[in-house]
């Protein structure tokens, strides 16, 4: 048990340590997939397969770890982990299927980037699953648990709705297109360039509220460090590609702010 506690604490420390370098590096150099795809990053695989493989630890590792937790027989632990699993079922299974069905582009996803994402999801999947199933210590505080869970769940559900809806719009534009990109319009796309990222940031803020933990907050913090610089780069990409046709008053990711 002591060795697992040590591993858990070092993994949590790692999650916080890598957040700032991630923000700084992605501010200057974008991961080469999607709109920012470019050569020079080694062999590639199909994007749907990449998404499936690199996101999968969040599912199988959670199912592997949960039975060994002291809260395995507590229904609240299953309730709490459900939004996390629901998000990653969409990201690991449904999203790659939508990509495979609707995308005609042949540009690959760098194996090196998928490998790094796989490593992060191992780290984060371990932390979130182990916290909920074993280390969380306030399940017995009924009032606090339910207030935090319901408030966080509301934020999470709204964020996931925004995220999935925006992803569907973007995938739909790929299906309509001739291999190129189009300006997304409607909904939150009128306010920000990347409502899909805004929705995901909302989700993990809601998760931080639900778990009420340094583990949940660390994931939210890292999500911001990963997605906000990419949203900024995506907005600049749109402005450069579409010039005056792209609305200059759209923010990158947070409506009216950033």
UniProtKB/Swiss-Prot annotation:
Family note: Belongs to the steroid 5-alpha reductase family.
Membrane spanning stretches: 8-28, 49-69, 77-97, 109-129, 144-164, 201-221
Keywords on record: Membrane, NADP, Oxidoreductase, Transmembrane, Transmembrane helix
EC number of the protein: 1.3.1.22
Taxonomic classification: Eukaryota, Viridiplantae, Streptophyta, Embryophyta, Tracheophyta
GO molecular function: 3-oxo-5-alpha-steroid 4-dehydrogenase (NADP+) activity; oxidoreductase activity
Any one Gene Ontology cellular component term annotated for this protein: membrane
Role played: Involved in a reduction step in the biosynthesis of the plant steroid, brassinolide (BL). Promotes cotton fibers (seed trichomes) initiation and elongation.
Annotated GO biological process: brassinosteroid biosynthetic process; seed trichome elongation; seed trichome initiation
Topology relative to the membrane: Multi-pass membrane protein
Expression across tissues: Accumulates in fibers (seed trichomes) during both their initiation and elongation phases. Also present in roots, hypocotyls, leaves, flowers and ovules, and barely in cotyledons.
Phenotype of the disrupted gene, per the record: Impaired fiber initiation and elongation.
Compartments where located: Membrane
Catalytic activity: a 3-oxo-5alpha-steroid + NADP(+) = a 3-oxo-Delta(4)-steroid + NADPH + H(+)
Native species: Gossypium hirsutum
Pathways involved: Plant hormone biosynthesis; brassinosteroid biosynthesis
Protein name listed in UniProt: Steroid 5-alpha-reductase DET2
InterPro entries on file: 3-oxo-5-alpha-steroid_4-DH (IPR016636), 3-oxo-5_a-steroid_4-DH_C (IPR001104), SRD5A/TECR (IPR039357)
